[in-house]
Amino acid sequence: MSSFEGKVAVITGAGSGIGRALALNLSEKRAKLALSDVDTDGLAKTVRLAQALGAQVKSDRLDVAEREAVLAHADAVVAHFGTVHQVYNNAGIAYNGNVDKSEFKDIERIIDVDFWGVVNGTKAFLPHVIASGDGHIVNISSLFGLIAVPGQSAYNAAKFAVRGFTEALRQEMLVARHPVKVTCVHPGGIKTAVARNATVADGEDQQTFAEFFDRRLALHSPEMAAKTIVNGVAKGQARVVVGLEAKAVDVLARIMGSSYQRLVAAGVAKFFPWAK
Protein backbone atom coordinates (compact mmCIF):
# COMPACT_ATOMS: atom_id res chain seq x y z
CA MET A 1 0.00 0.00 0.00
CA SER A 2 1.36 3.41 -1.00
CA SER A 3 1.44 6.30 1.44
CA PHE A 4 0.24 9.78 0.45
CA GLU A 5 1.76 11.79 3.29
CA GLY A 6 4.14 14.44 1.98
CA LYS A 7 3.55 13.44 -1.65
CA VAL A 8 2.96 16.21 -4.19
CA ALA A 9 -0.26 15.49 -6.08
CA VAL A 10 -1.37 17.38 -9.19
CA ILE A 11 -5.13 17.42 -9.82
CA THR A 12 -6.75 19.01 -12.87
CA GLY A 13 -10.44 19.86 -12.87
CA ALA A 14 -10.24 20.45 -9.12
CA GLY A 15 -12.92 23.13 -8.98
CA SER A 16 -15.79 20.71 -8.42
CA GLY A 17 -16.94 17.11 -8.59
CA ILE A 18 -14.43 14.28 -8.51
CA GLY A 19 -11.49 16.70 -8.70
CA ARG A 20 -12.55 18.55 -5.56
CA ALA A 21 -13.31 15.29 -3.77
CA LEU A 22 -9.86 13.95 -4.68
CA ALA A 23 -8.25 17.13 -3.36
CA LEU A 24 -10.04 16.85 -0.02
CA ASN A 25 -9.42 13.12 0.30
CA LEU A 26 -5.69 13.62 -0.31
CA SER A 27 -5.66 16.61 2.04
CA GLU A 28 -6.84 14.33 4.82
CA LYS A 29 -3.93 12.03 3.95
CA ARG A 30 -1.49 14.96 4.29
CA ALA A 31 -0.53 15.22 0.63
CA LYS A 32 0.65 18.51 -0.89
CA LEU A 33 -1.63 19.71 -3.68
CA ALA A 34 -1.21 21.47 -7.03
CA LEU A 35 -4.78 22.20 -8.14
CA SER A 36 -6.11 23.66 -11.37
CA ASP A 37 -9.37 24.38 -13.17
CA VAL A 38 -10.88 26.82 -15.66
CA ASP A 39 -13.51 27.66 -13.03
CA THR A 40 -11.60 30.02 -10.76
CA ASP A 41 -14.48 30.47 -8.29
CA GLY A 42 -14.89 26.73 -7.85
CA LEU A 43 -11.14 26.31 -7.61
CA ALA A 44 -10.90 28.96 -4.90
CA LYS A 45 -13.53 27.11 -2.87
CA THR A 46 -11.63 23.85 -3.19
CA VAL A 47 -8.45 25.59 -2.05
CA ARG A 48 -10.20 26.98 1.04
CA LEU A 49 -11.60 23.57 1.93
CA ALA A 50 -8.24 21.84 1.43
CA GLN A 51 -6.37 24.44 3.46
CA ALA A 52 -8.92 24.07 6.25
CA LEU A 53 -7.80 20.44 6.40
CA GLY A 54 -4.19 21.55 6.73
CA ALA A 55 -3.03 20.98 3.16
CA GLN A 56 -0.29 22.95 1.44
CA VAL A 57 -1.89 24.11 -1.81
CA LYS A 58 -0.77 25.78 -5.03
CA SER A 59 -3.60 26.67 -7.41
CA ASP A 60 -3.73 27.95 -10.99
CA ARG A 61 -6.36 28.63 -13.61
CA LEU A 62 -5.68 26.12 -16.39
CA ASP A 63 -7.33 24.98 -19.60
CA VAL A 64 -5.83 21.53 -20.13
CA ALA A 65 -6.43 21.78 -23.88
CA GLU A 66 -3.83 24.57 -24.07
CA ARG A 67 -0.57 22.64 -24.32
CA GLU A 68 1.85 25.49 -23.67
CA ALA A 69 -0.15 26.50 -20.60
CA VAL A 70 0.03 22.94 -19.26
CA LEU A 71 3.79 22.80 -19.83
CA ALA A 72 4.20 26.12 -18.03
CA HIS A 73 1.98 24.85 -15.21
CA ALA A 74 4.23 21.80 -14.77
CA ASP A 75 7.31 24.01 -14.56
CA ALA A 76 5.60 26.26 -12.00
CA VAL A 77 4.50 23.34 -9.85
CA VAL A 78 7.99 21.83 -9.79
CA ALA A 79 9.50 25.24 -9.03
CA HIS A 80 7.08 25.61 -6.11
CA PHE A 81 7.24 22.13 -4.56
CA GLY A 82 10.55 20.83 -5.91
CA THR A 83 9.03 17.60 -7.22
CA VAL A 84 5.83 15.87 -8.34
CA HIS A 85 4.82 12.36 -7.30
CA GLN A 86 1.25 11.92 -8.51
CA VAL A 87 -0.79 13.37 -11.38
CA TYR A 88 -4.57 13.02 -11.57
CA ASN A 89 -5.61 14.00 -15.10
CA ASN A 90 -9.24 14.53 -14.17
CA ALA A 91 -10.44 17.63 -16.07
CA GLY A 92 -13.14 16.92 -18.62
CA ILE A 93 -16.28 18.12 -20.33
CA ALA A 94 -19.35 16.41 -21.77
CA TYR A 95 -21.24 16.63 -25.05
CA ASN A 96 -24.36 14.94 -26.37
CA GLY A 97 -25.16 14.60 -30.05
CA ASN A 98 -25.34 12.02 -32.82
CA VAL A 99 -22.60 12.12 -35.45
CA ASP A 100 -24.89 13.42 -38.20
CA LYS A 101 -26.04 16.32 -36.01
CA SER A 102 -22.64 17.25 -34.57
CA GLU A 103 -20.38 19.99 -35.91
CA PHE A 104 -16.68 19.31 -36.36
CA LYS A 105 -15.92 22.02 -33.79
CA ASP A 106 -18.01 20.25 -31.14
CA ILE A 107 -16.21 16.95 -31.67
CA GLU A 108 -12.82 18.67 -31.75
CA ARG A 109 -13.48 20.46 -28.46
CA ILE A 110 -14.31 17.19 -26.68
CA ILE A 111 -11.18 15.53 -28.06
CA ASP A 112 -9.05 18.57 -27.18
CA VAL A 113 -10.14 18.62 -23.53
CA ASP A 114 -10.96 15.01 -22.69
CA PHE A 115 -8.16 13.30 -24.64
CA TRP A 116 -5.47 15.87 -25.43
CA GLY A 117 -5.88 17.31 -21.94
CA VAL A 118 -4.83 13.93 -20.55
CA VAL A 119 -1.95 13.66 -23.02
CA ASN A 120 -0.80 17.20 -22.24
CA GLY A 121 -0.86 16.58 -18.50
CA THR A 122 0.91 13.25 -18.81
CA LYS A 123 3.64 14.52 -21.12
CA ALA A 124 4.22 17.70 -19.10
CA PHE A 125 4.60 15.96 -15.76
CA LEU A 126 5.96 12.50 -16.66
CA PRO A 127 9.68 13.41 -16.52
CA HIS A 128 9.17 14.87 -13.04
CA VAL A 129 7.09 11.89 -11.90
CA ILE A 130 9.83 9.53 -13.08
CA ALA A 131 12.49 11.64 -11.34
CA SER A 132 10.54 11.50 -8.06
CA GLY A 133 11.43 7.82 -7.72
CA ASP A 134 7.93 6.96 -6.51
CA GLY A 135 5.46 8.20 -9.10
CA HIS A 136 1.90 7.57 -10.19
CA ILE A 137 -0.10 8.77 -13.21
CA VAL A 138 -3.89 8.51 -12.81
CA ASN A 139 -5.96 9.18 -15.92
CA ILE A 140 -9.73 9.50 -15.73
CA SER A 141 -11.55 7.71 -18.53
CA SER A 142 -15.22 6.76 -18.07
CA LEU A 143 -17.78 3.99 -18.13
CA PHE A 144 -18.03 5.23 -21.73
CA GLY A 145 -14.42 4.22 -22.21
CA LEU A 146 -15.62 0.63 -21.73
CA ILE A 147 -18.71 0.66 -23.95
CA ALA A 148 -20.00 2.93 -26.71
CA VAL A 149 -23.42 4.58 -26.46
CA PRO A 150 -25.57 6.39 -29.06
CA GLY A 151 -25.31 10.16 -28.78
CA GLN A 152 -21.90 9.90 -27.12
CA SER A 153 -19.69 9.22 -30.15
CA ALA A 154 -17.35 12.16 -29.50
CA TYR A 155 -17.17 11.49 -25.76
CA ASN A 156 -16.71 7.76 -26.41
CA ALA A 157 -13.87 8.50 -28.83
CA ALA A 158 -12.07 10.63 -26.24
CA LYS A 159 -12.56 8.23 -23.34
CA PHE A 160 -11.63 5.11 -25.34
CA ALA A 161 -8.51 7.00 -26.43
CA VAL A 162 -7.67 7.80 -22.81
CA ARG A 163 -8.00 4.13 -21.97
CA GLY A 164 -5.70 3.00 -24.78
CA PHE A 165 -3.17 5.73 -24.08
CA THR A 166 -3.09 4.92 -20.37
CA GLU A 167 -2.85 1.16 -20.74
CA ALA A 168 0.02 1.54 -23.22
CA LEU A 169 1.75 4.04 -20.91
CA ARG A 170 1.56 1.58 -18.04
CA GLN A 171 3.27 -1.09 -20.14
CA GLU A 172 5.94 1.38 -21.26
CA MET A 173 6.74 2.17 -17.63
CA LEU A 174 6.99 -1.55 -16.87
CA VAL A 175 9.25 -2.24 -19.86
CA ALA A 176 11.53 0.69 -19.03
CA ARG A 177 11.42 -0.21 -15.31
CA HIS A 178 10.61 3.35 -14.40
CA PRO A 179 9.38 3.85 -10.81
CA VAL A 180 5.96 4.95 -12.00
CA LYS A 181 2.62 3.22 -11.55
CA VAL A 182 -0.20 4.01 -13.98
CA THR A 183 -3.93 3.73 -13.33
CA CYS A 184 -6.89 4.17 -15.67
CA VAL A 185 -10.15 5.11 -13.93
CA HIS A 186 -13.63 4.34 -15.30
CA PRO A 187 -16.31 6.13 -13.25
CA GLY A 188 -19.97 5.29 -13.71
CA GLY A 189 -22.71 7.79 -12.92
CA ILE A 190 -21.30 10.40 -10.54
CA LYS A 191 -23.27 13.35 -9.14
CA THR A 192 -21.29 16.22 -10.64
CA ALA A 193 -22.03 19.30 -12.74
CA VAL A 194 -20.65 17.71 -15.92
CA ALA A 195 -24.06 16.92 -17.46
CA ARG A 196 -25.51 20.30 -16.47
CA ASN A 197 -22.54 22.04 -18.10
CA ALA A 198 -22.57 19.81 -21.19
CA THR A 199 -23.02 21.17 -24.67
CA VAL A 200 -25.38 19.47 -27.10
CA ALA A 201 -25.85 19.28 -30.86
CA ASP A 202 -28.18 21.76 -32.56
CA GLY A 203 -31.77 20.67 -32.06
CA GLU A 204 -31.00 18.69 -28.92
CA ASP A 205 -32.56 19.62 -25.56
CA GLN A 206 -29.73 20.24 -23.11
CA GLN A 207 -32.05 20.52 -20.11
CA THR A 208 -33.70 17.17 -20.84
CA PHE A 209 -30.28 15.53 -21.17
CA ALA A 210 -29.01 17.04 -17.92
CA GLU A 211 -32.16 16.29 -15.92
CA PHE A 212 -32.27 12.69 -17.12
CA PHE A 213 -28.62 12.16 -16.22
CA ASP A 214 -29.02 13.69 -12.77
CA ARG A 215 -32.24 11.79 -12.02
CA ARG A 216 -31.50 8.36 -13.50
CA LEU A 217 -27.76 7.96 -14.03
CA ALA A 218 -25.97 9.98 -11.34
CA LEU A 219 -25.92 7.28 -8.68
CA HIS A 220 -22.77 8.01 -6.68
CA SER A 221 -21.28 10.94 -4.81
CA PRO A 222 -17.94 12.46 -5.87
CA GLU A 223 -16.66 11.55 -2.40
CA MET A 224 -17.42 7.88 -3.01
CA ALA A 225 -15.67 8.08 -6.37
CA ALA A 226 -12.61 9.77 -4.87
CA LYS A 227 -12.37 7.20 -2.08
CA THR A 228 -12.52 4.36 -4.61
CA ILE A 229 -9.89 6.01 -6.81
CA VAL A 230 -7.50 6.76 -3.95
CA ASN A 231 -7.86 3.21 -2.61
CA GLY A 232 -7.04 1.88 -6.07
CA VAL A 233 -4.02 4.15 -6.34
CA ALA A 234 -2.80 3.02 -2.91
CA LYS A 235 -2.98 -0.58 -4.11
CA GLY A 236 -1.30 0.19 -7.43
CA GLN A 237 -4.26 -1.05 -9.46
CA ALA A 238 -3.98 -0.78 -13.24
CA ARG A 239 -7.73 -0.22 -13.62
CA VAL A 240 -10.27 1.27 -11.22
CA VAL A 241 -13.95 0.91 -12.11
CA VAL A 242 -16.20 3.12 -9.97
CA GLY A 243 -19.73 1.95 -9.18
CA LEU A 244 -21.55 -1.36 -9.38
CA GLU A 245 -23.29 -0.36 -12.61
CA ALA A 246 -19.94 0.39 -14.24
CA LYS A 247 -18.56 -2.96 -13.08
CA ALA A 248 -21.67 -4.73 -14.43
CA VAL A 249 -21.31 -3.00 -17.80
CA ASP A 250 -17.62 -3.90 -17.92
CA VAL A 251 -18.45 -7.57 -17.37
CA LEU A 252 -21.32 -7.41 -19.87
CA ALA A 253 -19.09 -6.00 -22.59
CA ARG A 254 -16.45 -8.65 -21.94
CA ILE A 255 -18.98 -11.50 -22.11
CA MET A 256 -21.06 -10.27 -25.05
CA GLY A 257 -18.31 -8.84 -27.20
CA SER A 258 -19.58 -6.60 -30.00
CA SER A 259 -23.11 -7.99 -29.64
CA TYR A 260 -23.58 -5.69 -26.61
CA GLN A 261 -24.15 -2.90 -29.13
CA ARG A 262 -27.62 -4.11 -30.14
CA LEU A 263 -28.64 -4.42 -26.50
CA VAL A 264 -27.42 -0.92 -25.66
CA ALA A 265 -29.01 0.58 -28.78
CA ALA A 266 -32.37 -0.96 -27.90
CA GLY A 267 -32.16 0.30 -24.33
CA VAL A 268 -31.21 3.81 -25.38
CA ALA A 269 -34.03 3.97 -27.93
CA LYS A 270 -36.53 2.96 -25.25
CA PHE A 271 -35.35 4.88 -22.19
CA PHE A 272 -33.29 7.88 -23.36
CA PRO A 273 -35.76 10.57 -24.49
CA TRP A 274 -33.23 12.66 -26.42
CA ALA A 275 -31.74 9.83 -28.49
CA LYS A 276 -34.41 9.39 -31.16
Swiss-Prot record:
Q: Which residues form the active site?
A: Y155
Q: Is Transport a UniProt keyword of this protein?
A: no
Q: Name one GO molecular function term.
A: oxidoreductase activity
| EC numbers, comma separated | 1.-.-.-
Observed effect of gene inactivation: Inactivation of the mymA operon causes altered cell wall structure, reduced contents and altered composition of mycolic acids along with the accumulation of saturated C24 and C26 fatty acids, and enhanced susceptibility to antibiotics, detergents and acidic pH. Also impairs ability to survive in macrophages.
Q: What class of enzyme is it?
A: oxidoreductase
Induction context: Expression is controlled by VirS. Induced at acidic pH and in macrophages.
Binding residues annotated for substrate, in chain numbering: S142
List the GO biological process terms. biological process involved in interaction with host; response to acidic pH
Q: Which PROSITE patterns match?
A: ADH_SHORT
Q: Known Pfam families for this protein? A: adh_short
Give the UniProt keywords, A-Z: Oxidoreductase
Instruction: Name the source's superkingdom.
Output: Bacteria
Q: Tell me, what does this protein do in biology?
A: Required for maintaining the appropriate mycolic acid composition and permeability of the envelope on its exposure to acidic pH.
The record's comment on protein family reads:
Belongs to the short-chain dehydrogenases/reductases (SDR) family.
Q: What is this protein called?
A: Putative oxidoreductase SadH
